[in-house]
Curated annotation (Swiss-Prot):
Gene transcribed to yield this protein: gyrB
Annotated protein name in UniProt: DNA gyrase subunit B
Catalytically driven reaction(s): ATP-dependent breakage, passage and rejoining of double-stranded DNA
Enzyme Commission number(s) of this protein: 5.6.2.2
Quaternary context: Heterotetramer, composed of two GyrA and two GyrB chains. In the heterotetramer, GyrA contains the active site tyrosine that forms a transient covalent intermediate with DNA, while GyrB binds cofactors and catalyzes ATP hydrolysis.
Gene Ontology BP, a term: DNA-templated DNA replication
Major localization listed first in the record, in broad terms: cytoplasm
Length: 805
C-alpha cells in the first residue's frame, strides 16, 4: 500500500453539525447555486407565509427587493413562535427560542404537525433554516401579542439573541436576507422570475393579497396580485387575448378521502378558438411541470366524459374519426390544483406528482362535475364537441401533410443544400446555424462565416404566422418546411426529438428595421409554439448586428444601440470640454464634469419614467404646489374615459381609492420618493433643481472647449447642455447607420456579428411561460383590440429617431 494513501477507517467519517451540511452541499437542498437556487430561497420564505394563508391565518404577503440587493418578505400571519423550545433547550443546555430552532435546525417547523397545517408546500421540507444557512445576513422580526421581537444571523449562526424591540400593533413575520456571494454564482434577483411565482401563488390561493416592489428600479411600479376568483381567474387571465368559446371558465372542485387523509382537487377549464393546449398543474401550490397523477386523472376523465356525451347524444353520425385526447384538448386552457396531506414527488425538484390515490380522486371529481355541467349547459357542450371534431379532421389532414413533407424531403434532398449552407463539423454541440433574412445577407454571411462550425440558412421574406395557422398549413409553408428539415429534430409534441437536433445554437440574424423585427418575432413564435424544447433547452439566440459604424480618421468602432451611441457622443463631447457656472464662477472639468453629466442623465431617466406613464414632464412641472411640492401619484382614468388628477400624499391616495370606482380609475405611482429626493439634492449642489432641465435659468452655464477657446457656448437649461455636448461629440466623426445586413460586407459581418470572440448574442430563455403565452397571443393572435391597446400604451416610450418609416 502506498504510504501516501490515507486509511479509510472510522476517522474518515465526517459528521456535519447543524446547518454546515447545507453550506457544504447546497445543491442537495436547493437544486443548484445559480439563478434557480437563488430564487428558491425566496420561495421557501414565501411558502411559509402561504402555509399560514392556507391555514386561514394570513391575508397579505409583501415581497420587496431592496436597493442594496437584499430582499424582505413580510406577512400578517400568526408570527413564528418566540417562546422557549423545551426539547432543544434541554439538548443544548441553554434557553433556545422556537424562532431560533426554526431558523437553525433542518426539518424543524409547524408543517410536520398536522394540527398546525393540514397541507403545506415548501421545496424539500428544509424551509427557512436552509435560507438562513445560505445567507450572508438574515434578520427575523416577529410581531406577536402586541410586541416586536428580533434576531439576527450570519450564515446560519446567531449574531444576536432574541431581543424585545418595541410595542407594536402589527401581527406576523418579517424576514430580511442577503444571499451569500460565497455560495451563489449570482446574488442578483430577477424580478420577472419572482413575479411569475408570486402571481401563481395569488391565483392558487383565492383571496390572498401579494404585493411586490423593486427598490432598485425607479421606473418600476408596485404590483399587487389579488384574485378573488382563484384559478378560475387564472384561466380567464390566460385566455384574455384569445377568442373563448364561452364566457366563464368551467370551475370544478371536490374533496375525497385518500390514503393519508382528505385530498382537495380543483380545476378550471375553458376552450378557445386557437390550436394550442395550455394546461398548468400544481400540487400543494408547487408547479408540477411534468404533470403526474393529478393531471393523468384529469385528462382521463375529460376524454371519457366528452366521448360519453358524444355517444349518448348521437353526435358522431357524420364524423367517423376516432377521437384522441389531443383532439379534445386542442384550444383548451386549464389550471389544475390539488392539495395532498402527504405529497410524493418524483425527482428532487418536485416536477411530477406520484401519489397513486390522487388519480382516482381527480377522475371522480372531474367526471361527476363535468357530466352535470354538460347536461345543464348543452349549448356549451355542443360548441366543445364541434371544436373537437374539427380538430380531429385537422389532425388527419396534418398527418397527411407531414407524411408528404417528409416523403418529399427524402426524395428531393438534393434541393436542401441549395438553401442550407452547411458546416464541416458534424458534432451538434460544436455547431451553430444562422437563420438569415434574405439571399443578399445570406451571401455575405456565407462568405464571412467560419465554415468549420457555422451553417447559414437564408429565408425569403416573412414566414407564416403560426399563431393563426393549423399544423396542416404550417407543413405546406416552404420556408418553415426548410427550417424543419435543416434542424432535423421534427416538430410537434409527438414528433419532436431534441437528440436529433443538428445545431446546438440556432441564431436568428435579421435587419435592424421594422421588417427585420417582424421576421424575428414570427420565427420566435414558431419556435415557441412548435419547438418549445429548443427555447427551454436554451438553443435559440438573437444576433445583435451593429446599428452604427463611427469613423474618425483611420479609426472606427461599431455601436449596437441608440443608448450606446448617446453615451459615446457625450464622452467625445466632454473629453476636451469644461463647464462654467457664471453666477458662482464654479468650473467643472474631467471627473467633476462627468459627475455633473451623470446627474443630468439621472434627470433624463426620471423624465423617461414619467413619460412612459403618459405624464409629460412639462405638465408635471406645472403641477408644483408651493409648500407641498410635486405630486406623488396620478389617478388615471380607464381607456376612453376623462378626468385624471394628481395626488400629493398617501392620505389623498387612500381617500381617492375609497371614493372612486376602482374599475374606472387606477393609481399610478409617479416615482420613488427617495430617488427623487436624491436627484434634487444632487442638483442643489450646482444651484439647480429638477425644473432646470426644461425651464431657462438665470444661472448661465458656459461650455468651453480646449480646442476652440473662442467658441464658448452659453446654455440656460440642462437639456441644452446635453444636446450641445452630443453635437460637439459629432464633430470630426463620420456616422453610418446600418438598416440592413446587406449593407455590410463579409468581413464586417464576421467582425461584428459572427465572430464568437467579439459578437453580442441575446439568449432566448423562458422565465415565465404564462407571460410568454400572453405576449405571443396578444402580438400575433387574431384579437385586434388587445394589440391596439398595447401599442397605444407603449407608444410614448418609443423614441422618434428609432422609428423606421
Amino acid at each position: 500500500m502506498d504510504p501516501k494513501e490515507k486509511n479509510y477507517d472510522a476517522s474518515a467519517i465526517t459528521v456535519l453539525e447543524g446547518l454546515q451540511a447545507v453550506r457544504e452541499r447546497p445543491g442537495m437542498y436547493i437544486g443548484d447555486t445559480g439563478i434557480t437556487g437563488l430564487h428558491h430561497l425566496v420561495y421557501e420564505v414565501v411558502d411559509n407565509s402561504i402555509d399560514e394563508a392556507m391555514a386561514g391565518y394570513c391575508s397579505r404577503i409583501d415581497v420587496r427587493i431592496l436597493e442594496d440587493g437584499g430582499i424582505v418578505i413580510v406577512d400578517n400571519g400568526r408570527g413564528i413562535p418566540i417562546e422557549v423550545h423545551e426539547r432543544e433547550s434541554a439538548k443544548q443546555g441553554r434557553e433556545v427560542s422556537a424562532l431560533e430552532v426554526v431558523l437553525t435546525v433542518l426539518h424543524a417547523g409547524g408543517k410536520f404537525d398536522k394540527d398546525s397545517y393540514k397541507v403545506s408546500g415548501g421545496l424539500h421540507g428544509v424551509g427557512v433554516s436552509c435560507v438562513n444557512a445560505l445567507s450572508e445576513k438574515l434578520v427575523a422580526t416577529v410581531f406577536k401579542d402586541k410586541k416586536c421581537y428580533q434576531m439576527e444571523f450570519s450564515r446560519g449562526i446567531p449574531v444576536t439573541p432574541l431581543q424585545y424591540v418595541s410595542v407594536s400593533d402589527r401581527q406576523g413575520t418579517e424576514i430580511v436576507f442577503y444571499p451569500d456571494p460565497k455560495i451563489f454564482s449570482t446574488c442578483t434577483f430577477d424580478r420577472s422570475i419572482l413575479m411569475k411565482r408570486l402571481r401563481e401563488l395569488a391565483f392558487l390561493n383565492r383571496g390572498i393579497t401579494i404585493v411586490f416592489e423593486d427598490d432598485r428600479d425607479v421606473s418600476f411600479d408596485k404590483v399587487t396580485f389579488f384574485y378573488e376568483g382563484g384559478i378560475q381567474s387564472f384561466v380567464s387571465y390566460l385566455n384574455q387575448n384569445k377568442e373563448s368559446l364561452f364566457s366563464e371558465p368551467i370551475y370544478i372542485c371536490g374533496t375525497r378521502v385518500g390514503d393519508d387523509g382528505e385530498i382537495e382537487f380543483e380545476a378550471a377549464l375553458q376552450w378557445n378558438s386557437g390550436y394550442s393546449e395550455l394546461v398548468y398543474s400544481y400540487a400543494n401550490n408547487i408547479p408540477t411541470r411534468q404533470g403526474g397523477t393529478h393531471l393523468t386523472g384529469f385528462s382521463t376523465a375529460l376524454t371519457r366524459v366528452i366521448n360519453t356525451y358524444i355517444k349518448a347524444h348521437n353526435l358522431a353520425k357524420n364524423n367517423k374519426l376516432a377521437l384522441t385526447g389531443e383532439d379534445i384538448r386542442e384550444g383548451l386552457t386549464a389550471v389544475i390544483s390539488v392539495k395532498v396531506p402527504n405529497p410524493q414527488f418524483e425527482g428532487q425538484t418536485k416536477q411530477k406528482l406520484g401519489n397513486s390515490d390522487v388519480s382516482s380522486v381527480a377522475q371522480q371529481v372531474v367526471g361527476e362535475a363535468l357530466t352535470i355541467f354538460f347536461e345543464e349547459n348543452p349549448q356549451i357542450a355542443r360548441m366543445i364537441v364541434d371544436k373537437v371534431f374539427v380538430a380531429a379532421q385537422a389532425r388527419e389532414a396534418a398527418k397527411k401533410a407531414r407524411e408528404l413533407t417528409l416523403r418529399k424531403s427524402a426524395l428531393d434532398s438534393a434541393r436542401l443544400p441549395g438553401k442550407l449552407i452547411d458546416c464541416l463539423e458534424k458534432d451538434p454541440e460544436k455547431c451553430e446555424m444562422y437563420i438569415v433574412e434574405g439571399d443578399s445577407a445570406g451571401g455575405s454571411a456565407k462568405q464571412g462565416r467560419d465554415r468549420r462550425f457555422q451553417a447559414i440558412l437564408p429565408i425569403r421574406g416573412k414566414i407564416l404566422n403560426v399563431e393563426k395557422a393549423r399544423l396542416q398549413k404550417i407543413f405546406q409553408n416552404q420556408e418553415i418546411g426548410t427550417i424543419i428539415a435543416a434542424l432535423g429534430c421534427g416538430i410537434g409534441a409527438d414528433n419532436f426529438n431534441l437528440s436529433k437536433l443538428r445545431y446546438r445554437r440556432i441564431i436568428i440574424m435579421t435587419d435592424a428595421d421594422v421588417d427585420g423585427s417582424h421576421i424575428r418575432t414570427l420565427l420566435l413564435t414558431f419556435f415557441y409554439r412548435h419547438m418549445t424544447a429548443l427555447i427551454e433547452n436554451e438553443c435559440v439566440y438573437i444576433a445583435q448586428p451593429p446599428l452604427y459604424k463611427v469613423s474618425k480618421k483611420k479609426d472606427f468602432r461599431y455601436i449596437l444601440s441608440e443608448k450606446e451611441m448617446d453615451s459615446y457622443l457625450l464622452m467625445l463631447g466632454t473629453n476636451e470640454s469644461s463647464i462654467l457656472f457664471k453666477s458662482t464662477e464654479r468650473e467643472l472639468r474631467g471627473e467633476a464634469l462627468e459627475s455633473f453629466i451623470n446627474v443630468i442623465l439621472d434627470v433624463e431617466s426620471f423624465i423617461n419614467t414619467l413619460e412612459k406613464k403618459a405624464i409629460p414632464f412639462s405638465e408635471f412641472l406645472e403641477m408644483y404646489k408651493e409648500g407641498i411640492g410635486y405630486p406623488l401619484y396620478y389617478l388615471a382614468p380607464a381607456t376612453g374615459m376623462q378626468g385624471g388628477r394628481y395626488l400629493y400624499s398617501d392620505e389623498e391616495k387612500e381617500e381617492a381609492l375609497a371614493q372612486e370606482e376602482t374599475h374606472k380609475f387606477k393609481i399610478i405611482e409617479l416615482y420613488k420618493v427617495a430617488v427623487f429626493v436624491d436627484i434634487q439634492n444632487q442638483l442643489k449642489e450646482y444651484g439647480l433643481d429638477i425644473s432646470s432641465y426644461l425651464i431657462p435659468q438665470k444661472n448661465e452655464i458656459v461650455i468651453g472647449n480646449e480646442d476652440s477657446p473662442s467658441c464658448n457656448y452659453s446654455c440656460y437649461t440642462l437639456e441644452e447642455v446635453i444636446n450641445y455636448l452630443k453635437n460637439l461629440g459629432r464633430k470630426g466623426i463620420e456616422i453610418q447607420r446600418y438598416k440592413g445586413l446587406g449593407e455590410m460586407n463579409a468581413d464586417q459581418l464576421w467582425d461584428t456579428t459572427m465572430n464568437p470572440e467579439q459578437r453580442t448574442l441575446i439568449h432566448v430563455s423562458l422565465k415565465d411561460a404564462v407571460e410568454a403565452d400572453h405576449i405571443f397571443t396578444m402580438l400575433m393572435g387574431e384579437e385586434v383590440p388587445p394589440r391596439r391597446e398595447f401599442i397605444e400604451s407603449h407608444a410614448l416610450s418609443i423614441r422618434i429617431n428609432n422609428l423606421d418609416i
